[in-house]
Every structure is written in C-alpha cells, then in structure tokens.
Amino acid sequence: MILSQQKYNYLAKVSDSNGVISALAFDQRGALKCLMAQYQMKEPTVAQMEELKVLVSEELTPYASSILLDPEYGLPAAQARDREAGLLLAYEKTGYDANTTSRLPDCLVDWSIKRLKEAGADAVKFLLYYDVDGDPQVNVQKQAYIERIGSECQAEDIPFFLEILTYDETISNNSSVEFAKVKVHKVNDAMKVFSAERFGIDVLKVEVPVNMVYVEGFAEGEVVYSKEEAAQAFREQEASTDLPYIYLSAGVSAELFQETLVFAHKAGAKFNGVLCGRATWAGSVQVYMEEGKEAARQWLRTSGLQNINELNKVLKTTASPWTEKVSVG
C-alpha cells in the first residue's frame, strides 16, 4: 500500500516506536451510558462521562501509543492525554436503529473530517456494521457512504481507520453458537470488500474471525471450532487484506484478549496492533460510580495499569509493524 508522506507521519504518531498501534479505545458513548447506569438510578450526566474519560486518558495514555475518543464527550480527555500519545477521533453517531436490520451508518452531523483534524486528530475512525450476505441495496448504500469518507480523508490527507462490526440480518445474538458458525466468513469477507482501493482506507479495525469462547481449549461449554479450524480462520483473515489491520477487544476480558493475540500470532496472523477498550478500563466504571473520582484513579493506577502493561508485553511478541505493509509515494 502506498501512503502520502503526511498520512505516514500521522500513522507514526498513533503508533509506538516499532510501528505497532497499541491504542486505547474510549470512544464509547451509548455503551458507556449503559455501563454507568447500572450503578445509579438516573441517567449518567455529560459531566460524569467526560470526567471518567479524562481520568482514563490521564492515567493510561502514558502507556499507550494513542487514544481513540469521541468528539461528543471526549475532547477534554484528548487535552488531558500524554503529550507523546497520538489521537484518533470517531466520526460516527453512536448505536444503530434496532427496529430495522439495515444498521445504516451515520456521521456526527456537526463534524467533518476537516473539523476533526482541526480538533487535533492524527487519524479518523468510522464504525460500520456490515453483513456481507445482507440486502444488496443496503450494502451498496454502505459502500457509497464509506467511499465518501475515504474521499474526505484523502482531501484532508489524514489516515482513515474503518472499524467493521459484522452481523447477520437473520441472527439477533452475535454471542450465539449460530453466529459463531458463520463468523469466519462474515469477518474475513467483509475485510476483502473494504480492502479495495476505491474506499481509501488506511487501517482496518476488525474483530478476530472466531468467537474464542467456542474454540477447543478455550470453551467451557459447546465447541464450534477445533484449534486447527480456528488457526485456519486467522490464516484466512491474514490473506483477506493487504492493508494494515488491528484488533478490537469486543468487550472480552483482558486475559482472554491477550490469550487471543497469542493464538492469532501462532496461527500466522500478521496483525499490526490493537485498539483495546473495555478489556483495559471497564473495571474503573463501577469504582467511579460507587466510590468516586479518586478511587477510580487508584483503580486505573493499579488494575488498569496492570491490564495495559500486560497487553503491551503481549503485543511486543505478537504484533507486526504496519511499516512492513506500506511505502511512501
């Protein structure tokens, strides 16, 4: 893949010195509200959401190559990040319409790539829900939407990270055995679609191609994939794209995510880092809501720091530098 010099420089800012993206994800909005709402009767306030994001940014960005935030609640946290840490900003509205299976994408209406760049972004992230077997007319709309964002990023000469969350229009539960059986195809074929040059994507942020809780040796209940079938799924994922790609943590535990990265590497996946969210900071939410700011800070300085240090240690031996996949032109 050929990158402009400026895009290359921006990507270097969100990566570590080895060319690996060890980024912290805290662009959650709807999901964060739901997490916080478990611990108080009324809806979480803007001030609470902003303050927790600031705490996580202050305490954990010294140990991350960059942080992904949203411009709705995350700009104070962007200002609070470590000066060596890069900044990715999310461009999509949170959530989707649960009354339809189409899950059409939507940008934040008062933002543009130009404005995100002016707010200090080193890269822009957009989340897309995609079913490769879904309604063809819906998928054409989604592809056209991504082309527009790719063109915007090209015009502003800023890296475009596309996050693909796969689903099946006919399966309501992504954690089910039923979805686990089709996940390899859903994830890897979506990556093939969006690796086309026309979309202007620089980095894919993707799911691992199997649900690890159904993999032999990891499963506590039903097994959907043998270890070899799971390893083959990771090899097929590696063959699905020439673009740099990074893994999202999908809300699994820190321990399972780290074990997954080791498994992926052994299988032959040359992934280029992670954008890890809840696996790192989720435990701070309850502490913040029940015990307050300083208790949450203490949790982040102990458990949160341990999570991110352990993840960084795993990345050192499993992730490949994206610099091997790109050249400047």
Curated annotation (Swiss-Prot):
Keyword Lyase: yes
Top enzyme class: lyase
Source superkingdom: Bacteria
UniProt keyword annotation of Lyase present: yes
Alphabetical UniProt keywords: Lactose metabolism, Lyase
This enzyme's EC code(s): 4.1.2.40
GO molecular function per UniProt: 6-deoxy-6-sulfofructose-1-phosphate aldolase activity; tagatose-6-phosphate kinase activity; tagatose-bisphosphate aldolase activity
InterPro entries: Aldolase_TIM, DeoC/FbaB/LacD_aldolase, LacD_aldolase, Tag_1.6-dipho_adolase
Pathway: Carbohydrate metabolism; D-tagatose 6-phosphate degradation; D-glyceraldehyde 3-phosphate and glycerone phosphate from D-tagatose 6-phosphate: step 2/2
Gene Ontology terms describing biological process: 6-sulfoquinovose(1-) catabolic process; D-tagatose 6-phosphate catabolic process; lactose catabolic process via tagatose-6-phosphate
HAMAP family registered for this protein in UniProt: LacD
Protein family membership: Belongs to the aldolase LacD family.
Name of this protein: Tagatose 1,6-diphosphate aldolase 2
Gene source species: Streptococcus mutans serotype c (strain ATCC 700610 / UA159)
